[in-house]
Amino acid sequence: MAAEMRVTVSQLLKGIDRYNPENLKVLEHYVHLQVHENAYDLDANLAVLKLYQFNPAYSQTSVISQILLKALMNLPNADFIMCRCVIDDAIQQDLTIKKVILLAERLETCAFTSAWQFIKEEASLVDGVTGFHDAIRNYITYVIGVTYQTIEESLASELLGGLQGAQLQDWIKAKGWMSSDDGTIYVTNQEAHIKSKNIAEKIDFASVANIIAAAR
């Protein structure tokens, strides 16, 4: 459903209709689909936030919190910062929004144990957000990968939100790590296998033009 709607929304956001408040119902429904189907469309979500910014009376904090949570699921990319920048200060004082921002601060500063404790205490905040916990684990896995060459299983378990036993071993295997009998995990770290290489990366302006326009 979300995949099918993505095409419709993409057409809807072209030209002056991008900031037509009459499109909000469709866009808000699309946000709900992203949340429930573990889909993601940053451009559409930024358009919703912009419409709220231009039309404060239409703002819905429940939708804003969902957009922010989806942005957190895309860490370490800067989506959360981009979204927060177009949310009015008054709305950021809403209790639910403040909780999401607090969680973001803990994740962005790598206070992962504290973040998981917060998620446990505020479980209702992320209830219904499909794939949230694993998305956060993927981000933490990325941080571990650029920080450690080896890590104790007990610490990895703590950082990954309490994964233990078969769940932890499955995660280790899926990420290409290796676990030894003494409880040490050998992390696949690209920096440990540095090779001289020339990298040429082409950036297609068209692929980011919509996001740049939305962030203005």
UniProtKB/Swiss-Prot annotation:
What's the subunit arrangement here? Component of the eukaryotic translation initiation factor 3 (eIF-3) complex.
* Superkingdom per UniProt: Eukaryota
Q: Which residues form the PCI domain?
A: 40-202
Q: Name one GO molecular function term.
A: translation initiation factor activity
Localization of this protein? Cytoplasm
In UniProt terms, what function does this protein have?
Answer: Component of the eukaryotic translation initiation factor 3 (eIF-3) complex, which is involved in protein synthesis of a specialized repertoire of mRNAs and, together with other initiation factors, stimulates binding of mRNA and methionyl-tRNAi to the 40S ribosome. The eIF-3 complex specifically targets and initiates translation of a subset of mRNAs involved in cell proliferation.
Chief location of this protein? cytoplasm
Keyword annotations: Cytoplasm, Initiation factor, Protein biosynthesis
Its name, as the record gives it, is: Eukaryotic translation initiation factor 3 subunit K
Cellular component per GO?
eukaryotic 43S preinitiation complex; eukaryotic 48S preinitiation complex; eukaryotic translation initiation factor 3 complex
